Swiss-Prot record:
This is ATP synthase subunit g, mitochondrial. It comes from Schizosaccharomyces pombe (strain 972 / ATCC 24843) (Fission yeast). InterPro entries: ATP_synth_F0_gsu_mt (IPR006808). It is found in: Mitochondrion membrane. GO terms for cellular component: matrix side of mitochondrial inner membrane; mitochondrion; proton-transporting ATP synthase complex. The gene is atp20. The lineage of its organism: Eukaryota, Fungi, Dikarya, Ascomycota, Taphrinomycotina.
Length: 118
């Protein structure tokens, strides 16, 4: 009676013995299949890099000429949320619940049933 590990090792040995592909032949086949693709991609690479550099220079010129700068802390979007009072938060919460309810009712009317699409 054979143990499972002995059977598996025997199967692996037979598989490796019967395989007629060596690493070298597999590498040669892969090289033969991918060489045309690599040549096409290398032909496209130069125009892509050229236009990427042109775009970068154009963006830099616009950035400097328009005096664009990253937003400062005085215009931070978090200041809007910090300035909200608890009354405003409650009002906005109930407005959001109302909007979600109207959306769900519209979905039910559109599907002509209360349950989801299933």
């Amino acid at each position: 009676m054979f143990s499972t590990s002995r059977i598996i090792s025997r199967i692996n040995y037979n598989f490796l013995r019967k395989s007629h592909y060596s690493t070298k032949t597999v590498a040669e086949q892969a090289k033969g299949r991918f060489t045309p693709l690599i040549q096409k991609l290398s032909a496209v690479q130069q125009p892509i890099m050229y236009w990427a550099n042109v775009s970068k220079e154009l963006v830099q010129q616009v950035y400097h000429s328009q005096k664009i700068a990253p937003p400062s802390n005085t215009h931070s979007p978090f200041l809007f949320w910090k300035s909200q009072s608890s009354e405003a938060w409650g009002r906005n919460f109930f407005i959001a619940v109302e909007i979600v309810g109207i959306f769900c009712a519209g979905q039910m009317v559109g599907r002509r049933k209360i349950t989801p699409y299933h």
